[in-house]
């Protein structure tokens, strides 16, 4: 099965930082993968909040070195917002895939069944998140870009420079 591939063209402090290409696990997590794919293309238009259902222009608002890089809050931009293509929140699909190492793509949440649009990319193995966060993809190109983003992180999570998804979409 060929998994769909999506991309983020990233900027750090307004400067191009490169492309992150991710494959989405449509076999085990089809609803979660479809949500992320559609938020990369922007094809669903405007959501219930009145904001476009699109990652383009959104920030990575939380970056913690030796842990993860988190983004996807395109409504508030600070980690309090976001919206799925299914409405505000949707259920945890399953926890079959694990947080095995750098490049794992997983849903950020505020507890069980609170998935929206926020996600994170692991920079290390984060097995304590297994069974709590839905893994739905992985970085297949551009792990160096993820590492560059990680370098502008902080222990509080607030990036020292703005990290923005300048463009995004689907490759295959």
UniProtKB/Swiss-Prot annotation:
Q: How is its activity regulated?
A: Binds cyclosporin A (CsA). CsA mediates some of its effects via an inhibitory action on PPIase.
- Got a GO cellular component term for this one? plasma membrane
What is the predominant subcellular site recorded for this chain? cytoplasm
The enzyme's E.C. designation: 5.2.1.8
Q: Where is the PPIase cyclophilin-type domain?
A: 7-170
Specify the domain of life of the species encoding this protein: Eukaryota
The UniProt catalytic activity note for this protein reads: [protein]-peptidylproline (omega=180) = [protein]-peptidylproline (omega=0)
Give a GO biological-process term.
regulation of protein phosphorylation
Q: How is this protein named in the record?
A: Peptidyl-prolyl cis-trans isomerase CYP18-3
Instruction: Report which gene this protein is encoded by.
Output: CYP18-3
């Amino acid at each position: 099965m060929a998994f769909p591939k999506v991309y983020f063209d990233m900027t750090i402090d307004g400067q191009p930082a490169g492309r992150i290409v991710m494959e989405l696990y449509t076999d085990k997590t089809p609803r979660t993968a479809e949500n992320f794919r559609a938020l990369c293309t922007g094809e669903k238009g405007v959501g219930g909040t009145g904001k476009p259902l699109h990652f383009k222009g959104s920030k990575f608002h939380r970056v913690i070195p030796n842990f993860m890089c988190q983004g996807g809050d395109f409504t508030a931009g600070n980690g309090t917002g976001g919206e799925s293509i299914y409405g505000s929140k949707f259920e945890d699909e399953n926890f079959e895939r694990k947080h095995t190492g750098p490049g794992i793509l997983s849903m950020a949440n505020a507890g069980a069944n609170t998935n929206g649009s926020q996600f994170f990319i692991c920079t290390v193995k984060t097995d304590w998140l297994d069974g709590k966060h839905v893994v739905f993809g992985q970085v297949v190109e551009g792990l160096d870009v993820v590492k560059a983003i990680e370098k502008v992180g902080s222990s509080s999570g607030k990036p020292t420079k703005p990290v923005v998804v300048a463009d995004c979409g689907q490759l295959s």
